[in-house]
Amino acid sequence: REVFFGRGTCFACHKAAGQGITLGPDLNGIRTRHDVNYVIRSILIPDEYIVEGFQQTSLAMKDGRKLFGMIQEETAEMVKIYLPTGEQVIIKAADILKRDDARNSGMPSSFTYTLNERDVADLAAWIMTLE
């Protein structure tokens, strides 16, 4: 908990224990979907597992705007994109000139440098307790 809400700054993108925001996947109940090794690898090598709905996408619009974020919902007529600011924008699919889906995670890959082994172990263990 200390790492999540402290120097790990995980709460800035993830929701857990009723706190944080949802720029990244909700971590509550992750133990029912994955084991602790998945959690550790996701912290240290975030590009290895990109959860569906959290892939970074860049949209070039016909009106010249560029939007970057995560596609939250999509139909043949519209796209709902979640911007890094937390804003959700709904646009007409016909207004998209070009779309680029990133092959990497939006999660920083710097945790191998900013967290020590104990921090990662404590963080992963705490995440696995979340209901």
What are these model-predicted stretches?
Residues 1-16:
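Sequence/structural segment immediately N-terminal to covalent heme-attachment motifs in c-type
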